[in-house]
């Protein structure tokens, strides 16, 4: 029988740089169909997606994840071939071993073991997998699949996202939510001119400066028990001109909010627009909502996960909402209890990305135990 390490070896061998799947999902679908899962591919443009389900009735527990990985960077800086799993003293190296093909290997191995142990369990076990998580095509992935499932009347009760949530060892941190992300591209027009004749020009840098001073000093909220205060960061400023004696005629500015449940995207938009209005400016603003904040601070799923972690590593997990966004933001709005439980994130997106064989085994065992608590007990 194929063990976790062999499954991970197979998955790492697919060079699935986002949004390419490169054969990962074909492998996973064949694996799951052999167990009796019904699989449907829901590909969308360059992004590969599939949903798989075992069982007909009862609560539906879905394991969600992504097969795509970030680029490897300079291959010469790796100590190993990034697309060939290599073990050194119990540590496994390869692009995606932690984020998140290691979790996928644990999910597959667990599913086979669970179905063999409980072939007629009173519930349903599912997989929601995309190759569009790491790049700009995320809207073609999980949110698209969720729309399709809603159209089919498929309701998910619980979802475990296999993102690398842990800090020092598998299970020590569970993500119970994530901040929202809102971006803005702002264009302010002025009038180009010579610096010696400012009265004949209109400098957009000068005009926007008091607005930026106001926005960067603003206390958006105080956060709450689960989230830090909302933050805003300016990520890009560019002006025309490109010469020391030219007043630029236009300005482009990008900013991003990471916001708590104390805010909505509309409340943030209003405050930004009001700041510009206060200074008699009316720029063109293009907004992009990357994801709303979500929080699972109670419920059967969270309690089952907390108890499972305590049983397997001897301590309760830290419950956190830190870090960037995840695809959980597209699943939670459908009323699903969502948590993230995965491997250690210390080396994700880095050269020599790695995880330990011990953590893989621990995570697989925890996934199995959670399934028992939710679908058997």
UniProtKB/Swiss-Prot annotation:
Active-site residue list: 68, 133
Positions that bind Zn(2+) 1: 66, 99, 163
Top-rank EC class of the record's enzyme: hydrolase
Cofactor(s) needed by this chain: Zn(2+); Co(2+)
The entry's keywords: Amino-acid biosynthesis, Cobalt, Diaminopimelate biosynthesis, Hydrolase, Lysine biosynthesis, Metal-binding, Zinc
Disulfide-linked positions: none
InterPro entries referenced in this protein's UniProt entry, alphabetically: Bact_exopeptidase_dim_dom, DapE_proteobac, Peptidase_M20, Peptidase_M20_dimer, Peptidase_M20A
Residues that coordinate or bind Zn(2+) 2: 99, 134, 349
Family statement: Belongs to the peptidase M20A family. DapE subfamily.
Name of the protein in question: Succinyl-diaminopimelate desuccinylase
Species of provenance: Legionella pneumophila subsp. pneumophila (strain Philadelphia 1 / ATCC 33152 / DSM 7513)
